[in-house]
Amino acid sequence: MADRAEMFSLSTFHSLSPPGCRPPQDISLEEFDDEDLSEITDDCGLGLSYDSDHCEKDSLSLGRSEQPHPICSFQDDFQEFEMIDDNEEEEDEEEEEEEEEEEDGDGDGRAGGGSGSQELSGESLIPSPSIEESHKLRPTTLHLTTLGAQDSLNNNSNGGFTSAPPSSWQETVLRSPVQEPLKELPAPLLPAEEEHHEVQSLARPGCDCEGNQPPEPPASGGASPSSDPGIEADLRSHSSGGHEGRRSSQELSSPGSDSEEAGGARLGRMISSISETELELSSDSGSSSGRSSHLTNSIEEASSPASEPEPEPEPEPLHEPPRRPAFLPVGQDDTNSEYESGSESEPDLSEDADSPWLLSNLVSRMISEGSSPIRCPGQCLSPPAPRPPEEAASQANPVPQDCPDPEAVAGPHVELVDMDTLCGPPPPAPAAPRLGPAQSGPCLFLSNPTRDTITPLWAPPGRTARPGRSCSAACSEEEEEDEEEDEEDEEDAEDSVIPPGSRTTGSTAPLDASLVYDAVKYTLVVDEHTQLELVSLRRCAGLDNDSEEDSSCEASEEEAGATLLGSDQVPEDASPDSPDLTFSKKFLNVFVNSTSRSSSTESFGLFSCVVNGEEREQTHRAVFRFIPRHPDELELDVDDPVLVEAEEDDFWFRGFNMRTGERGVFPAFYAHAVPGPAKDLLGSKRSPCWVDRFDVQFLGSVEVPCHQGNGILCAAMQKIATARKLTVHLRPPASCDLEISLRGVKLSLSGGGPEFQRCSHFFQMKNISFCGCHPRNSCYFGFITKHPLLSRFACHVFVSQESMRPVARSVGRAFLEYYQEHLAFACPTEDIYLE
């Protein structure tokens, strides 16, 4: 019997899916949790788009059922199991008796036992007004046999069986309550007819021991209780081929021979349970029906022991599943495949309708029950041609016409490997009832680059599975050669070797174990003695070329001049219209993308511009966004430089927005005063004795986590250069005049257009913490500044046609003189203690 722990594992099952199974469009950055940078990603259009909880989706999908049908949610089942948990042992004994009575064909005795258990459970409960109704709508056992979904295609009747205590969470999922197929129910049951109908469905005169009924057309007038319209259409349209489909279903239900009917019934119950769980979790009943029923057919083919591969033409390379499981990638299907998904909502169905973790456990359970896998994965894909009855009987493909349109079958790229059953050779005989206790079953993984296919993966004899590497690299090149030698007599040549032109989900080279579930890779090395490597956003499917071939500075040194190409190859997902796709969250370029203004590095320095022919510096900085509601009000955005011209008595300021060039009034508390130039002794005594000017090009600024270090400086340079190469043809770097003095560094930007107003940023020398050129390319120069008020740091990067070492020496000289004068003022060394 299933207990509360099993039902809880079923209800929380989808929340345990790996984070790699997600849609390819999804570029969410969950590796970093910088709270102060979340607003920038929202403004840039990136958005931290997390997938909603799978349990939440399940509850929504269960609530979208149009017609009332008796499918219970996992939460309701959990409550019902909790109510009648005390009678579990009594009902276990009754189910054993009922199973014996069912084999003898005594249907009346089973019905009596079921009603007895119903009375016992009803007496032990606290009386409530609706307790009798709820138990009338439920079956007489804890199997919930009144329900069913996709297993109506299987024609498997389910008897009771007792399950051992769960040993692992995989076994817990497999031992879910057995469901009753819907095909034998003409209409939704009424309370008065339920007991009589259950006697007929569980033990019929014309059924064999497994409950397979003789072929007879379904009732045309009764409405099907299934909420899946695709299954209803298939049942009505393919009722003419009942003999062939039901004959193959009977063969599927009994693996091997008639002496193994108990194992076949257990397989049928397992497939019924898992298939119904998948239907309850499907979010879109219309589009998921074809996929789910197609998955059921694939599972049945894998459970058939006598399935012999039909001679088929050599499949195309794109239709061939990969031989080695690599990881759980997130990626799109082949665009040139004929099985490409035609709807945008298909990726959403992969988490609910396909239930890949359920399928992996189902397949491993089928192997442990003694079935052998299919030899040719192509049998699950294309509808086979009409065959004679003898050939159809030997070919285990129930209801071959049930395969929907191939475009409806296509799904996202999912590759799944079972963790526990990786080792073990293929069974010697196709009808082996059960593997030895010390020999684990072979590993089957679901691989559907363009469709759902169950493909076997055999480990060589004598090898043990390494659980840590079963998802990343299940077998190396040497293991592949051993596999090919072992399977030469059993599998075709096209199944043993991957064609060179076929698309594989991972790299052809063995992948490292650290790449498991690594959908998005970021590398930021800040150690000064380590080779710096900053990798942009990429999928793990392209890990063979994910690192930049050349650093940004090396490439520009080779190409000479102010070339901004940071690497020889531009990422595929990068486009000039969306330059933020390659931005990591540690380094956000805020000057390159002018639309992102919150948390910008413009607030690190003092902004100045020409106002009425005179250069004026900002006096305030906007801390909130202000939307004007009257013509005389001034629009403000966060970090806008503001020149306050007048302060009103009613706490309103009249000022000039240096970013927009507009004047108006705004609330006084929407802007804070910024610390102006140093009014100390150093600044008031004399003007700077010297000023150095350099003509350079300004690339951008980026926020950095530390205030100094060559690693930080080089990482910021490479990040900005890599980002600028995407927009260099749209917005070339602005020419900039650097003025270096004892007061600080002043950036005067000037554009080519007449509408561009000349502006400048001033960084006080006391806020400059680090500067230098790139160690391998002196054309790049940058310096790190501290925010005047906050504990934040930003790096500003420049490039020039010539070496920028004179700029670095000038800044170093100014800093040294400023530091000496500051020490002389702050810590005077007078001979006050000498006599």
From Swiss-Prot:
Domain of life: Eukaryota
Residue spans of biased composition, Polar residues class: 142-173
Residues covered by region (Disordered): 1-26, 44-357, 369-509, 544-579
Composition bias, Basic and acidic residues: 233-249
SH3 domain segment(s): 615-676
Pfam families linked to this entry: PID (PF00640), SH3_9 (PF14604)
Biased composition regions of type Acidic residues, renumbered to the chain: 77-106, 335-354, 476-495, 545-560
Modified residues (Phosphoserine): S257, S304, S307
Function field: The JNK-interacting protein (JIP) group of scaffold proteins selectively mediates JNK signaling by aggregating specific components of the MAPK cascade to form a functional JNK signaling module. JIP2 inhibits IL1 beta-induced apoptosis in insulin-secreting cells.
Similarity field: Belongs to the JIP scaffold family.
Record's protein name: C-Jun-amino-terminal kinase-interacting protein 2
Organism for this UniProt entry: Rattus norvegicus
Designated gene of the protein: Mapk8ip2
